[in-house]
Design a protein with these regions (language model features):
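Conserved SAM-binding loop
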Residues: 1-59, 66-97, 101-111
Length: 111
């Protein structure tokens, strides 16, 4: 980080606006993700584990209460993002098809 600061390349996502953010396997770990997304002007690219039900989450290998702050269903994530001013542009399960069980990727655009 010192090198980034020295060369004036450090970006603080909670303070400095940007056009796009890419968060692969990150969102579910952030208690304050709405604060970060408030500084993103155009695009949010996300990959998160998705669950069908609470029971499904509790039985999943992705159930990590010491690491994960959030457990999303597909509709739950889309609804939260909608409330934060985002619209779903694309969703894919390619990561799951490639062996990353229950991981889905999303592209959201700012409304």
């Amino acid at each position: 980080m010192a090198w980034l600061h020295k060369h004036e390349l450090y970006w603080n996502p909670r303070i400095d606006p940007c056009d796009a953010v890419s968060m692969w396997d990150v969102l579910e770990h952030m208690p304050d993700f709405p604060e970060l997304l408030a500084n993103v002007r155009r695009w949010a690219f996300l990959a998160v584990p998705l669950f069908q039900t609470v029971h499904h989450a509790l039985q999943s290998r992705h159930f990590r209460p010491d690491e994960h702050c959030w457990y999303f269903t597909k509709d739950g994530l889309i609804d939260v993002m909608d409330e934060l001013g985002w619209r779903l542009v694309e969703m894919t399960g390619i990561e799951t098809m490639l062996g990353r069980d229950q991981i889905f990727s999303f592209a959201f655009a700012r409304r």
